[in-house]
UniProtKB/Swiss-Prot annotation:
Pathway the protein acts in: Carbohydrate metabolism; tricarboxylic acid cycle
Cofactor(s) recorded in Swiss-Prot or TrEMBL: heme
Topology, Cytoplasmic side: 1-15, 81-90
Organism, as annotated: Escherichia coli (strain K12)
Subunit structure, interactors included: Part of an enzyme complex containing four subunits: a flavoprotein, an iron-sulfur protein, plus two membrane-anchoring proteins, SdhC and SdhD. The complex can form homotrimers.
Identification of the protein by name: Succinate dehydrogenase hydrophobic membrane anchor subunit
Binding site for heme: 71
Gene name linked to the record: sdhD
GO terms classed as biological process: aerobic electron transport chain; aerobic respiration; cytochrome complex assembly; tricarboxylic acid cycle
Matches recorded under PANTHER family: SUCCINATE DEHYDROGENASE HYDROPHOBIC MEMBRANE ANCHOR SUBUNIT
A molecular-function term among this protein's GO annotations: metal ion binding
Binding site for a ubiquinone: 83
Primary localisation category: membrane
UniProt xrefs under InterPro entries: SQR/QFR_C/D, Succ_DH_anchor, SuccDH_FuR_B_TM-su
Record's cofactor remark: The heme is bound between the two transmembrane subunits.
Length: 115
């Protein structure tokens, strides 16, 4: 078995399970947000702040952000591995994507817990 240091999971089955699990988390988060928008009536700044003042909403939002990170990394790794053959270019693109995803999650963490 070939081990790849840039893959997130231990093997293809592990990646498959991670992608499915993160998809479920993201689907539940979308349902949660749609439910909020459908039941909140008029959406004002105070309502929005009140919604994100809840610890459950903050934790669920961060879980969704981490799920996006994992889901996107596995998907982009698979696409780059399949279609970008020059090693240097593939590693550079992987680095750029990882940095962008990590910055995205850190920024999301700051925004969510800054409310």
């Amino acid at each position: 078995m070939v081990s790849n240091a840039s893959a997130l999971g231990r093997n293809g089955v592990h990646d498959f399970i991670l992608v499915r699990a993160t998809a479920i988390v993201l689907t539940l988060y979308i349902i949660y947000m749609v439910g909020f928008f459908a039941t909140s009536g008029e959406l004002t700044y105070e309502v929005w702040i009140g919604f994100f003042a809840s610890a459950f909403t903050k934790v669920f939002t961060l879980l969704a952000l981490f799920s996006i990170l994992i889901h996107a990394w596995i998907g982009m790794w698979q696409v780059l591995t399949d279609y970008v053959k020059p090693l240097a270019l593939r590693l550079m693109l992987q680095l750029v994507i990882v940095v962008a995803l990590v910055v995205y999650v850190i920024y999301g963490f700051v925004v969510v817990w800054g409310v």
